[in-house]
Amino acid sequence: QSNPDLKAFYCANDTMALGVYEAVVNAGKQDQVMVVGTDAIANAKESVKNGEMAATVGQDNVGIGVACCELAVKAVKDGWKADPSAEMPVEYIDSFLVTKDNVDDYL
């Protein structure tokens, strides 16, 4: 209500996005406001398939798990500790966009 010209929401996770979409519907603006989430959970993919949410961004969850385990092993085995003042290592993890055009590939 305080931002009537709002065109889109990008949410940090799909649970938030599904709630935002519900609020958008309750405001009667589902044809005017785009909602995109993150995580590609089953309910969000169904929402995308049904033309409700515009998209969801999924990640390589196995890759995230492997990277976390490797860091944990390094911490235990080598005594590695994060130095808050040092530049932290970056691990890039693949992501993918699920839209109405490709949602069936991810269901």
Model-assigned labels for residue ranges:
Residues 14, 59-62, 66:
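Electropositive phosphate-/nucleotide-binding environments in soluble metabolic enzymes
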Residues 2, 23-27, 47, 51, ...:
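Structured segments of extracytoplasmic/periplasmic soluble domains
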Residues 1-46:
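Hydrophobic alpha-helical
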Residues 39, 60, 101:
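Residues at the C-termini of beta-strands that transition into short coil/loop
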Residues 5, 32, 52-53, 94:
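A generic structural signal for alpha->beta connector loops
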Residues 63, 67-107:
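Hinge/cleft segment of the Venus flytrap/periplasmic-binding protein
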Residues 50-62:
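Short beta-strand elements at the ligand-binding edges of bilobed clamshell
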